[in-house]
Amino acid sequence: MTLTPLAVRPSTETEFDPRPSLAVWKFASCDGCQLTLLNCEDELLEVADRVRIAYFPEATRATVAGPYDISLVEGSITTPSDAERIEQVRAASRILVTIGACATAGGIQALRNAASVHEYLTVVYPHPEYIATLGRSTPIAAHVTVDLQLRGCPIDRHQLLEVIAALLRGRRPRIPTASVCTECKRRGTVCVAVAEGMPCLGPVTQAGCGALCPAFHRGCYGCFGPQDTPNTASLASVLGDQGTDRRDVRRLFATFNAGAEAFRSQGLAAPDAQEVAP
């Protein structure tokens, strides 16, 4: 994707306001990644000064019709109406950025992909015929073209600000693609996997959280999803050699990014795990 400075190309519907337009969309999610934008605190006023927040129901009822220069999309696709709506969002967006584990990998709700959704519906709802749902929870990229993605559950606010700043300047955002292990080394955190034998997904998880969990003496649970070259099979073997029960290894990979293929191969779709097709 070729990026040009957004400041020189405002949406036609907002020509009276020279700022690029920003829209924030929610699909199947908890709202945590949207709230990251509101939690920018000191930087939020500067963001609002540089971009026009045209659509953001979490923050305001005021809306401006598209098209939009930037769309931040949170959540996975779980219903037929979601699948239709994301097509409309894509058509109305110059640049579409997925934010968070739900949007980039299907989220925790992707656990449904390893079971029969029909069975769940008949057990939970007295009239399942009224429930419109898809058999799987899928990331946004499975339905439309995605220009950029931000990992995490929730995303890191500094990365979000970097993406917005980069798009305004027409450059690629500087988002790390190394593993969480590099962040442990930078902050001088003792490796909990080597020193304590704790199960840790740090070697295969993308950096971005600042190695928060290891800093508090617990293993990484992979909320930023797999890094560019994750050897999850090797890590699963090492975890087993350290004494971690195979069922616990599967559970470790089957959390926030259970639908990401590299994690799915050792979690929901592991050779000794039974996956029920929807």
Predicted features along the sequence, with ranges:
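Catalytic or ion-translocation cores adjacent to nucleophile or general acid/base/metal-coordination motifs
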Residues: 98
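Iron-sulfur (Fe-S) cluster-binding modules
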Residues: 1-72, 82-83, 87-95, 118-278
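Short, hinge-like loop/turn segments at secondary-structure boundaries
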Residues: 113-117
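Short glycine-/small-residue-rich Rossmann-like dinucleotide-binding loops
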Residues: 75-77, 101
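Short gly/pro/ser/thr-enriched loop/turn and capping motifs at secondary-structure boundaries
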Residues: 102-107
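Short secondary-structure transition/capping segments
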Residues: 109-111, 163
